[in-house]
Amino acid sequence: MDESGAGRRKEDHIDIVLAGGRVASRLDAGFDRVRFVHCALPELDLDAIDLSTRFLGRPLKAPFLISAMTGGPARAESINAHLAEAAQALGIALGVGSQRIAIEDGSAGGLGADLRRRAPDIALFANLGAAQLLAARGLDAARRAVEMIGADVLVIHLNPLQEAIQQGGDRDWRGVFDRIGSLCVSLSAPVVVKEVGFGLSGAVARRLADCGVAALDVAGAGGTNWALVEGERGTGRSRAVATAFADWGIPTAQAVVEVRAACPDLPLIASGGVRHGVDAAKAIRLGADLVGQAAGTLKAAITSTEAVVEHFSQMTDQLRIACFATGAADLDALRRVPLATMD
């Protein structure tokens, strides 16, 4: 794909996701079918509830990840600056969007050394597509992705359905699994593998765990549907093809349960259709260690650093109150509280 076309595609992605509606998954994330048992006598100080955690050795003040959003286009520079500054202020993790354009043509979109200067203390996740590992210098590109932003972790995203519908997308995925395994051995930074909104099954998660990944992000169905996003960008035919996949994928809550059962000890991120801090509490109760949000943050990210801080402060308040209302003094206790129903 030519560089100008890739940049235009990233701009289109921002506009389409902001418009919402038509590209939302027809599946819900599944959190509404999870119910906590309310604790009317918590015997806790709300303000003393501890939401801090560690993920891959990095301390976090709350179990939130600003998930991969955008990389490359000029507009991404201010978005990524706002996200980095907010993550630093909040003490939460930040995952950048795909760095493919930045690596191939230098259009950094805020994905350079300045990002780490804005957020010197956060857990910072670099990002590259799995299909890019198949290129002759794919493993070198992965190392560059980490180095160019001073990242702690490299995220490899799996998006075969999106690529199948995208004009000019990567259609041959033979050898991707072996390249991920090679990367896990050769890269000094931990490797995290994520989907992009269609979910990881327990079987795929187990294969990835066996090849050496440090953590997984289920990135389940229930939020943005990237098949529909690519359909919006394409011709009438590609839009018609994409529409058939409007309800495709593994809902996030189901994916968390499946992956946790398949990989009991592997660090796990839940993302995909997380709306608020109560959804985050449910994801943690089901087995997640960290909770990510992307599209739900985008409007705030375009506005200002302060808007992003306010957005995640609200989510943190909601999570803290959910702990309080279930009698959980910290995240470990939240993982043990009873559930009323899970259909």
UniProtKB/Swiss-Prot annotation:
CDD domains, sorted: IDI-2_FMN
Compartmental location: Cytoplasm
Which cofactors is this protein said to need?
FMN; NADPH; Mg(2+)
Q: What class of enzyme is it?
A: isomerase
Q: Name one Pfam family in it.
A: FMN_dh
Q: Which SMART domains match?
A: IMPDH (SM01240)
Give GO MF terms, alphabetically: FMN binding; isopentenyl-diphosphate delta-isomerase activity; magnesium ion binding; NADPH binding; oxidoreductase activity
List the Gene3D superfamilies hit by this protein, alphabetically. Answer: Aldolase class I
**Enzyme Commission designation:** 5.3.3.2
Read off the SUPFAM superfamilies from this record. FMN-linked oxidoreductases
The function of this protein is: Involved in the biosynthesis of isoprenoids. Catalyzes the 1,3-allylic rearrangement of the homoallylic substrate isopentenyl (IPP) to its allylic isomer, dimethylallyl diphosphate (DMAPP).
* HAMAP family in alphabetical order: Idi_2 (MF_00354)
The entry's family comment says: Belongs to the IPP isomerase type 2 family.
Question: What do we know about how this protein assembles, alone or with others?
Answer: Homooctamer. Dimer of tetramers.
Q: What is this protein called?
A: Isopentenyl-diphosphate delta-isomerase
- Native source species: Xanthobacter autotrophicus (strain ATCC BAA-1158 / Py2)
Highest lineage ranks of the organism?
Answer: Bacteria, Pseudomonadati, Pseudomonadota, Alphaproteobacteria, Hyphomicrobiales
